[in-house]
A protein has these predicted regions:
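Generic structural signal for buried aliphatic residues
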Residues: 25, 299, 324, 426-429
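Conserved helicase motor core of P-loop NTPases
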Residues: 5, 29, 37, 154-160, ...
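Short, conserved phosphate/pyrophosphate- and ester-handling motifs at nucleotide-, phospho-/glycolipid
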Residues: 22, 76, 271, 423
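ASCE P-loop NTPase helicase motor core
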Residues: 26-27, 31, 36, 41-45, ...
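Conserved pre-motif I regulatory segment
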Residues: 2-40
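Conserved SAM-binding loop
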Residues: 18, 72, 267
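Short coil/loop residues immediately preceding or within conserved phosphate-binding loops
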Residues: 39, 321, 413
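C-terminal accessory regions
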Residues: 335-475
Length: 475
């Protein structure tokens, strides 16, 4: 009785008539929310275009109307901003919610698990495919296992429970072969009762979308295991999905910038090296930037940083992948054999402005961040400044507060790799598939392609698309 009332309430907040899949999901959601079992978890999986976002938007709206508490979380600032947009409620990063910075500590661990003081609260996590359970920054956050810490945090609260949402066709976290947060067996390992539903029906509003038509083909190939052959992409009959050759590229990117803005346009490439080539080309030939760094430049953080926003309530660390905009360049200089710049920047996903020191050397490296040998060189050269400090612990304390050692590592952010784009969405995406041989095909490539396709909301441009990928090309 109450169950059907709740289902009806959520349905009324739907922007259109729900699909059969969504009706099933609504019933499961209602059962889950009304269940007496506090140790239950709902896994809501859905492919692009199947209406996960509409479903959750309607759920959040209904929870608010019924004065029930919900908290929205996502793995990155960019993903949290996208989530906030479609759910109509502020979303936070997982790190922001479940960790607290240690106030006075010389330990290497900077953040420890926070206490969950919420009661009777539903936690909804979007883009769960990105949640790792092996920390690259394992000494910094809690146990270093994000999924473990998230589950522990939620279920330590009084009558709190968790919905994990994600797309199993997307890339798993870096260095992992699958997304642990979307694996029901992994989740049952926490002694939770796991219910799951997978949305597969593409909603009617998306039927004319070439992006979703072709993303669905890739998803079907992943489900059927037919990933050792070139994917056949349909280009005819769609206005949002098309080829662009090298001669047209500059003009097309330029018109996307003029029409929708630089912040709504992204080039996705297969390697950091290609991304660097694109970034330089865009700065020189479209933005006409002659200086290495100029006001207005968009930069992407290349490595987590815990120094420049420490203690800031909105943003207590700067995450790898965040995009910042340069407001003004105060000075550039050389020191310790490296080049630095003092700049004022805006964090676009937090509406926050601050002054930082950035490392210019990483702008042109083919590596994702400063390579280890150069990191070591920077560390030991700066360490010499503290020769007068008698103890090793004292030296390390000085290094922890040294602005040059804690410099922000950045890359230009006009073109990025697919892993860096994950969790974000842009109106225009230019995708450079680059040179592909049959040996390079397989599940990883299909996931990469699917993830790249689904970053675009309005238009996807396939740059120099190899003809083997076209539906009507001979195989």
């Amino acid at each position: 009785m109450i169950n059907s009332y709740l289902s009806r309430q959520i349905t009324q907040n739907f922007p259109y008539d729900p699909t059969e899949d969504q009706v099933l999901a609504l019933n499961l959601l209602s059962n889950f929310l009304l269940s007496e079992e506090s140790d239950s978890l709902l896994l809501l999986k859905g492919y692009a275009g199947t209406g996960k976002t509409s479903l959750v938007g309607a759920l959040v709206k209904t929870m608010t109307e019924l004065k029930q508490k919900s908290i929205l979380l996502a793995p990155t600032g960019r993903a949290a901003k996208v989530f906030s947009g479609y759910a109509g409620q502020k979303a936070f990063t997982i790190h922001k919610k479940i960790y607290r910075q240690k106030a006075f500590s010389n330990e290497p661990t900077g953040f420890h698990p926070a206490d969950n003081l919420h009661k009777d609260t539903l936690f909804i996590v979007d883009e769960a495919s990105m949640i790792a359970n092996e920390g690259l920054d394992s000494f910094v956050f809690g146990t270093g296992r994000l999924l473990d810490d998230l589950v522990q945090y939620v279920y330590s609260g009084e009558n709190c429970r968790l919905i994990l949402m994600g797309d199993v066709a997307q890339l798993p976290p870096v260095m992992q072969t699958e997304s642990p947060a979307l694996n029901p067996e992994t989740l049952r390992g926490y002694n939770l009762k796991v219910q799951e539903i997978t949305l597969t029906q593409v909603v009617r509003q998306s039927e004319n979308s070439g992006i979703l038509f072709n993303a669905t083909r890739l998803r079907d190939a992943l489900r059927n295991g037919t990933v050792e052959i070139f994917p056949k992409l349909r280009l005819k009959g769609f206005t949002d999905f098309r080829k662009v050759n090298g001669d047209e590229l500059i003009e097309e990117i330029s018109s996307a910038y003029s029409r929708d803005g630089i912040e709504e346009t992204m080039i996705i490439s297969r390697s950091n090296k290609r991304a660097t080539l694109y970034n330089n080309g865009i700065r020189n030939r479209i933005l006409y930037r002659e200086e290495e760094l100029s006001s207005g430049d968009r930069l992407m953080i290349a490595k987590n940083n815990y120094f420049w926003t420490a203690g800031n309530k909105e943003m207590d660390f700067i995450a790898n992948g965040e995009i910042i905009q340069v407001l003004r360049v105060r000075r550039t200089y050389e020191l310790y054999g490296f080049r630095f710049a003092d700049v004022s920047v805006r964090f676009q996903d937090y509406d926050l402005e601050t002054d930082v020191k950035i490392l210019l050397d990483t702008l042109q490296t083919a590596a994702p961040a400063l390579p280890k040998d150069l990191n070591d060189k920077l560390f030991y050269t700066i360490l010499e400044d503290y020769d007068d400090v008698p103890t090793k612990a004292g030296k390390m304390k000085k290094m922890k507060t040294d602005p040059h050692y804690n410099v922000l590592q950045v890359k230009y952010a006009y073109a990025v790799t697919c892993h860096k784009a994950q969790g974000g969405q842009w109106m225009n995406v230019f995708l450079d598939i680059d040179y592909i041989t049959e040996e390079m095909l397989g599940e990883d490539f299909y996931r990469w392609l699917y993830t790249a396709f689904t970053r675009a909301t309005h238009r996807l441009y396939l740059v120099n698309l190899p003809e083997e990928f076209e539906e009507y090309a001979s195989s």
